[in-house]
Design a protein with these regions (language model features):
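Acidic (Asp/Glu)-rich catalytic clusters
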Residues: 12-13, 89-103
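Active-site neighborhood of glycoside hydrolase catalytic domains
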Residues: 1-60
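Carbohydrate-interacting/catalytic domains
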Residues: 33, 41-42, 60-66, 81-95, ...
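Structural preference for beta-strand elements that scaffold enzyme active sites
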Residues: 16-20, 45-49, 68-70, 100-103, ...
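Conserved, mostly hydrophobic/aromatic
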Residues: 11, 21, 48, 108, ...
Length: 268
């Protein structure tokens, strides 16, 4: 254990402050509890991310023994009900007190069916959901940015996996998401309402393929509303019920809506 601890300290000395731990549930729980506590004595700012896609009870225990952040089932939550139910579980139950989710649409090991068959729109959908539902999110970089969706037939694995071959990525490939991802990340950085997971509220929309939710800063100074079309194959439309009463806006009062993705502004 001491030798393994020395490895972590070596990388901390090189400036590393975030450790993604692969499959921590396959190692003894007492080891992780001891190691994380030892590291935090000197470096309380170090983050340990649990990369464990396993049973809920095991994922929760890893969070309780010290992992700051955890992988989740977001990767496989695609419908309106699936996403809503899961977010309520994460943000409105006792799990909120110890489990900090980190949303990943894909990983080097996992290419979910939604991305395999939904084309570029599916990648856009999952990116926006991950970036706006959770304060913490990540992507397996070039494969996601270039919308790579070729899978091993019948499996959720990349057909030509970077794990087994050296890739020469064409970052300017047609259809890439570079600028879109940069825009979304800029919006997250500039808007404090998106920098926490616990302020999430779902709102009414009359279409099962549209997900409508919002986040607000604690002081009420900023409100972000997000609408996502969960259907990667078709354009969808619907009527939203804007919660103007929460924002102190009277029904007969016009207000400014700023579309942060397009930078367009509207008077509603």
């Amino acid at each position: 254990w001491e030798e393994l601890k020395s490895v972590v300290f070596f990388w901390i000395d090189q400036g590393i402050r975030i450790f993604r731990v692969d499959n921590p549930h396959t190692k003894p729980f007492p080891f992780w509890e001891w190691l994380i506590a030892e590291i935090r004595k000197d470096y309380p700012e170090v983050i340990f991310l649990s990369e464990a896609f396993t049973r809920p009870k095991v994922m929760k225990r890893l969070a309780k023994i010290g992992f700051n952040q955890s992988y989740t089932y977001f990767t496989w939550r695609n419908s309106k009900k699936e996403i809503t139910d899961y977010m309520i579980e994460l943000t409105q139950t006792e799990q909120k007190e110890y489990f900090r989710p980190n949303f990943w649409p894909n990983t080097p090991d996992i290419l979910p069916e939604f991305l395999q068959f939904g084309g570029r729109p599916a990648f856009v959908i999952k990116l926006v959901l991950a970036a706006t539902l959770s304060s913490n999110y990540g992507i397996y970089g070039p494969a996601f940015e270039l919308c790579v969706n070729e899978a091993v037939p019948g499996k959720e694995e990349y057909l030509n996996s970077e794990k087994y071959e050296i890739k020469q990525w064409n970052w300017d490939q047609s259809g890439n998401l570079k600028q879109f991802i940069a825009r979304v990340n800029r919006i997250r950085r500039e808007n404090p309402a998106l920098q926490t997971t616990w302020n999430l509220k779902f709102y009414e929309v009359d279409n099962e393929y549209l997900l409508f939710y919002g986040k607000e800063t604690a002081d009420g100074a900023e409100s972000i509303l997000t609408v996502v079309n969960l259907d990667p194959y078709h354009t969808q439309s619907g009527w939203l019920k804007i919660p103007i009463y929460e924002f102190g806006i009277s029904p007969d009062q016009p207000y400014l809506c700023h579309d942060l993705l397009s930078d367009d502004k509207y008077i509603w």
